[in-house]
Structures are given as structure tokens and as C-alpha cells.
Amino acid sequence: MNLIGACWMRRSLDEPVSALFIDDNHNIIAGGWDGRLAKWNASGDLLWSVELPDRVGSIAANENGIYATAGLHLSALNSENGALMWQHPLEGSADIVTTVDGLVYATSSVYDIEHNDFIDSAIWCFDLAGSQLWVKHMPERPWTLDELDGNLYLGLGRPKMGVAQVSSGGDVEHKALDSNSSVTASVNF
């Protein structure tokens, strides 16, 4: 079967794609393994392309901008032209980003090769201007970061596993699950 014939649009980032996001206007925002971030409109026209410090791990967007984790950094870009609005280094690898109620949340993690495991993780909160409001450290690595009904949830790995609910003020409440497995994927419609 030739899948190319079934495609309505084909665009190249000129590097392997590491993250993909479709915004509310059906624009496609793609990030690559070498740090390129590009935005196409719903018709497939390239609107802009920029270079970030490292591999793009996660992308989020709202009416105020586009947010991406790239290597050790969280970056905020102008949605219209891709201009960098602000950028912050996080502790360890910048992993996941999302926006909820006018705030930008990101997770980071530190991996120790000797222990062959994650030794520290954090959830960060920034306002839209890029000011850090708070950071909370935890021993579990957050594998997912999702909003549901105005609440922010983390899917957790070892040692506690399960789910954590995070308030806008930074309170983290662990919720155990029946399973003793890490929560590494989620679906939010």
C-alpha cells in the first residue's frame, strides 16, 4: 500500500521529528532531534522555522505563544513569527510542557548513570511573561503532564508511581492506583 497517496500534506523538517503539536487553528508545529522548531498553517504553508538549543521534547501552545522543551531549556516563542520571548534552563533534562489557565508548567528530570535511574525530578510553574512562580522537587519522574477539568495531573514512575494532582500554587497530592506500574502514557480529549 502506498501511504504517500493518502497524505493530504507532506512537509519536511529536514531532521528526524521528535515532537508534534496541532493547535486550535489546525496549524502544525513540529520539533526535531537537532533543535529545529517549525510551524505550518492548515494549508501546509511554512510560516516560520527557528533553531532551539537541543532536541525538542515537548510542545504546547495557547493564545499567547508556543512553548517547547529543548534539551535543558524551556523556551517561549511568538506564535506569529517564532521569535524567542523567553528561555529558562531547568535542572536536568527539560521533559514535558503544557499550559493551563494562563500558566506554563514544565517537568524536568535528572538521570544518574551510576544508579541507572532518575534521582530527582521537578515540576516548574511560570507565568506568561516567563517569571518563575514556583518549583517542586520529587523523587518520582513524571512521565506525563495533562490537564483535566482545570486540574493538572502527573503520571509518575518509581518510587511512588501512580498519579499526582498539582494545584496552581504548587501543592502536589499523590494518588495511588491499583497497579504497581509507572504511568507512562495518557490520553486527553
Region locations from a protein language model:
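A short helix->beta-strand "capping" segment at the edge of beta-propeller domains
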Residues: 1-15
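A structural motif specific to WD40 beta-propellers
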Residues: 8, 45-49, 83-86, 133-134, ...
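Repeated scaffold domains used in trafficking and secretory/extracellular systems
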Residues: 15-21, 54-63, 91-101, 138-149, ...
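Acidic/polar residues in short coil/turn loops that connect beta-strands
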Residues: 23-25, 34, 43, 62-64, ...
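Conserved beta-strand element within WD40/beta-propeller blades
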Residues: 29-31, 67-69, 106-107, 154-156
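WD40 beta-propeller blade core
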Residues: 38, 75-76, 124, 162-164
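Short loop/turn segments that connect beta-strands within beta-propeller blades
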Residues: 41-45, 78-82, 126-131, 167-170
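Short, solvent-exposed loop/turn segments at conserved positions within beta-propeller repeat blades
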Residues: 68-69, 113-120, 157-161
